[in-house]
From Swiss-Prot:
Annotated S-S bridges: 118-165, 132-179, 142-195, 146-197
Protein's UniProt keywords contain Magnesium: no
PROSITE patterns: CTCK_2 (PS01225)
Name used for this protein in its record: DAN domain family member 5
Keywords: Disulfide bond, Secreted, Signal
Organism: Xenopus tropicalis (Western clawed frog)
Amino acid sequence: MLLFRAASLLPLLCFTVGAFPFMDEEGSGSFAQEVLHSRSYPLANAHRGPFVDLPLFRQNRRKISQNFILHSDPREHMDEEALRRKLVWESAIRREKMRSHPDQVLPIGQDALKRSRCHALPFIQNVFRKNCFPVRLPNKFCFGQCNSFYVPGWPAGLSQPCTSCAPSRSRRISLPLRCRAGHLAWQEVELVEECECETRYDRNTVEPAGSGEGFLPVS
């Protein structure tokens, strides 16, 4: 009975000895290096099962690892002809977009832009209200020449740009006015400090601050 069991275990013992041969200290170190080397390629060894470190598979493992390449760019999977057709198609799409929305260049010289001038000039402003005494207030007004343009084919629904000499820096104050019967009225006035050419895209008009204001420019 014991001989029968020993005979049945003999093939299994031979297979184990062939798969895992005896190693000395140097051999055990090289075997550990082989195991660590196999762990550095988890994706390449995942489909080969648990017998990847057996001596039967060690010779082919290096070839499989060298042929295993990670592809991140989908163009690398295309052949040369398919890649060429894709590049031609992308170039045609870019040209079509440039034709439908081309850049417009206006031939405007630097000398024409330099002729645009806008200044803040001093004057004496008379601020008054009905039944009140007027007050003379030093102020400034904008005067100059600003370049404007009109481009045909402007998109419908959009106003044409209009350039004007307008205040770029100003502040508003409340000015007291002495009125009849000893009453005191307050009038809001805009004090202009600096002016420059600005472009507007609407036709809104700016009404003067205060009804019945008078302007006396300084000569």
